[in-house]
Amino acid sequence: MKGSTVHTKWQAYCRLMRIDKPIGSLLLLWPTLWALWLAGRGIPEAKILVVFVLGVFFMRAAGCVVNDYADRHIDGFVKRTASRPLPSGTISEKESKILFVVLILLSFGLVLTLNSMTIWLSLAALALAWIYPFMKRVTHLPQVVLGAAFGWSIPMGFAAVSESLPLVCWLLLLANICWTVAYDTQYAMVDRDDDLRIGVKSTAILFGQHDKLIIGLLQLATLLLMVAIGWLMNLGGAFYWSILLAGALFTHQQKMIAQREREPCFRAFLNNNYVGLILFLGILISYW
């Protein structure tokens, strides 16, 4: 019985950290890899690569924990989130706070192996991870904060590799924010009815009937910014082909969200993993 209880608890911790749902980690990983390869104009130093990849998974897990802690009193009223560990009582509030601290300490321990510029930038990453879950209570634009949080590994990556923050770094961050707002609006469309009922704010609610158009414009902005980055970095044809393929995926996503149905909107959100992967492959091949 004791072994069964331990197993159940472990499963609950894994669910709290979304280990069973890696899509968030992947959407955080791709822009991190974009930045590391662009900053180093090719394969980055092995130590830096390992630190950032591990950091992605630790910080994403920490972000999920603080998100669920912030939403612990409302998740029980949303069909998709009612069974999460905190609202269901499988994990206590104290246990979630301890887990968050452990994950942050692990992440900061990794950052301490890098240069001082990266260490200072990591403090902003922590602040963004902490405040994002609470933004949906005060603004209809929490997705913009999420974009900054998911993209903050970009200036950190440039700082770690080159100890500089060039124009390309900020263009890449802006592209990632546009992309994140687009795909997280798709995600928010899944919960829009529940969010309206319980008073949670999101871009899906703010954009209303213009949601598909604005998502399309954000996707276009992402692609145009990527073209500018390719030109500034003198990337090869493979990168521009990857932009075209990403555009094709965005077009496919528009078809999926056309009727604003929950399941297709969620599939459109998941499809963004391939966008990030394809753009990374374009950068990778350009420096081959």
Swiss-Prot record:
Its main location: membrane. Its cofactor is Mg(2+). It is found in: Cell inner membrane. GO terms for cellular component: plasma membrane. Keywords: Cell inner membrane, Cell membrane, Magnesium, Membrane, Transferase, Transmembrane, Transmembrane helix, Ubiquinone biosynthesis. It comes from the Bacteria. It is a multi-pass membrane protein. It catalyses: all-trans-octaprenyl diphosphate + 4-hydroxybenzoate = 4-hydroxy-3-(all-trans-octaprenyl)benzoate + diphosphate. Pfam families: UbiA (PF01040). Gene3D superfamilies: UbiA prenyltransferase (1.20.120.1780). The chain crosses the membrane at residues 23-43, 46-66, 98-118, 141-161, 163-183, 213-233, 234-254, 268-288. GO terms for biological process: ubiquinone biosynthetic process. CDD domains: PT_UbiA_COQ2 (cd13959). Its EC number is 2.5.1.39. One of its GO terms (molecular function) is 4-hydroxybenzoate polyprenyltransferase activity. Pathway: Cofactor biosynthesis; ubiquinone biosynthesis. Catalyzes the prenylation of para-hydroxybenzoate (PHB) with an all-trans polyprenyl group. Mediates the second step in the final reaction sequence of ubiquinone-8 (UQ-8) biosynthesis, which is the condensation of the polyisoprenoid side chain with PHB, generating the first membrane-bound Q intermediate 3-octaprenyl-4-hydroxybenzoate. NCBIfam families: ubiA_proteo. Belongs to the UbiA prenyltransferase family. This is 4-hydroxybenzoate octaprenyltransferase. It comes from Yersinia pseudotuberculosis serotype O:1b (strain IP 31758).
